[in-house]
Amino acid sequence: MNTDTTLFILEDCRANLLIVEDEKTLQALYPYWDQLPHLKKIIKWGQPINDLLYSGNVINWTDVMTLGMEFEDNRPMLERHKNIAINQCCSLIYTSGTTGNPKGKIILFRSINI
């Protein structure tokens, strides 16, 4: 997916979190940080990042895992899980956009309820 398409999707869905797989992708997208007002953090998979380059806006996946371990005792997600309704959005999937901009398709929890 090219940068323009990625930026369109991030703005269209008002993404507040982005996970990138490598430094190349991070370096391609980070210059657009100021154009994505909803984006709060970028999580980078793999090697640790140089936080000084990214002003605290990017964290490494291992840091996310550490935060998860700290939350394990508090169980904040358990309470959120109890409040999920079957008609709420579970996932947002975008089409390829062959005839224009990609279009988002909402997948509800009831669609994947097993």
PLM segments and residue spans:
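Structural core segment of the AMP-binding/adenylate-forming
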Residues: 1-67
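Short, well-ordered alpha-helical scaffold segments within catalytic/effector domains
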Residues: 3, 26, 74-77, 113
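Active-site-proximal glycine-rich helix-loop-beta segment
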Residues: 14, 99-101
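Extracytoplasmic/periplasmic beta-strand context in beta-sandwich domains
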Residues: 40, 103-105
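Conserved pre-ATP/AMP-binding loop-to-beta segment of ANL
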Residues: 58-62, 66-94, 101
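Conserved structural elements of the adenylate-forming
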Residues: 86, 105-114
